[in-house]
């Protein structure tokens, strides 16, 4: 990511406010992807970050606001946490590397990018295939896409070249990998489907994982629910995970399923 890329955004622009809301509503897909990224031996994401606003009052009593990116993101169902990436332009009380916790309803954007899998050329088509690495495809980036929509075609090309990302069509913002080719990925992450049998075996070998509770009151069922992983949630419930257990904030896994609007999880809780 280019340092300080599009830090400032117009908080009074209705379309920018709409972009903020879209980012907040769809953040769950970002977190779902990141929940699997943290389990991968070989990283699959080129970039994964969240944008939020940061402010302070200057010596004249005026409020200074900058929108900047954080990475190393964590999420507990309510709060997004991470470390500041950008160097502020005007803010003086924060710096890159500072840790922040931001309520989900206060983030302004999220972005992740994945390098598309290259299909191997066969036969005659090999003569016309390129050996160049494909450009990582961006997902999310609602405020970025709003700004791209306001640019001329040449400005968009320069912008995308600076980021070295394929942002696609600003009118069709995708939130999950291969969304156009595999719309079923909106319902469940492919790794969740593919790992179901392995997860069953894992719980058979480590049954204590069903009942382990961390210092904040979260169980594995809470975590998998927040990430929207249907197969994992089904396996946990069928194995006897207690869906009534509440975190220190007083929320059950089912509460998080409803709060984050993971519609595909709700029948699993009602059934078990």
Q: Where are the language model's segments positioned?
A:
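Short coil-to-beta-strand transition motifs
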Residues: 60-71, 75
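Ankyrin-repeat boundary/"N-cap" motif
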Residues: 180-189, 211-220, 246-252
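Ankyrin repeat A-helix N-terminal signature
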Residues: 189-195, 223-229, 256-262
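Intrinsically disordered, low-complexity regulatory segments in ankyrin-centric signaling systems
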Residues: 167-206
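Short solvent-exposed strand/turn elements
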Residues: 80-102
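Short coil-to-beta transition motif at edge beta-strands of beta-rich domains
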Residues: 37-62
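Ankyrin repeat domain, specifically the short helix-to-loop turn at the C-terminus of the second helix
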Residues: 201-209, 234-242, 270-272
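Leucine-rich solenoid repeat scaffolds
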Residues: 243-272
């Amino acid at each position: 990511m280019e340092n300080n890329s599009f830090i400032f955004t117009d908080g009074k622009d209705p379309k920018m406010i709409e972009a903020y809301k879209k980012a907040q509503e769809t953040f769950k897909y970002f977190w779902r992807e990141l929940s699997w990224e943290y389990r991968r031996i070989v990283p699959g994401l080129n970039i994964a970050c969240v944008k939020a606003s940061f402010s302070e009052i200057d010596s004249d009593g005026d409020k200074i606001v900058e929108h900047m990116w954080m990475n190393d993101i964590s999420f507990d169902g309510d709060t997004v946490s991470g470390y500041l990436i950008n160097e502020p332009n005007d803010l003086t009380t924060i710096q890159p590397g500072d840790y922040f916790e931001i309520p989900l309803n206060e983030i302004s954007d999220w972005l992740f990018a994945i390098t598309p899998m290259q299909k191997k050329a066969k036969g005659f088509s090999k003569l016309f295939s390129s050996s160049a690495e494909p450009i990582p495809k961006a997902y999310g980036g609602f405020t970025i896409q709003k700004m791209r929509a306001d640019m001329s075609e040449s400005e968009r090309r320069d912008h995308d070249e600076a980021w070295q990302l394929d942002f696609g069509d600003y009118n069709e913002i995708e939130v999950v990998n291969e969304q156009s080719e595999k719309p079923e990925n909106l319902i469940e992450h492919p790794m969740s489907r593919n790992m179901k049998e392995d997860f069953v075996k894992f719980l058979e070998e480590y049954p204590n994982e069903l009942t382990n509770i961390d210092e904040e009151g979260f169980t594995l069922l809470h975590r998998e629910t927040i990430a929207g992983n249907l197969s994992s949630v089904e396996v946990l419930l069928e194995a006897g995970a207690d869906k009534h257990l509440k975190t220190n904030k007083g929320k059950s896994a089912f509460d998080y399923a409803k709060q984050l609007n993971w519609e595909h999880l709700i029948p699993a809780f009602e059934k078990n």
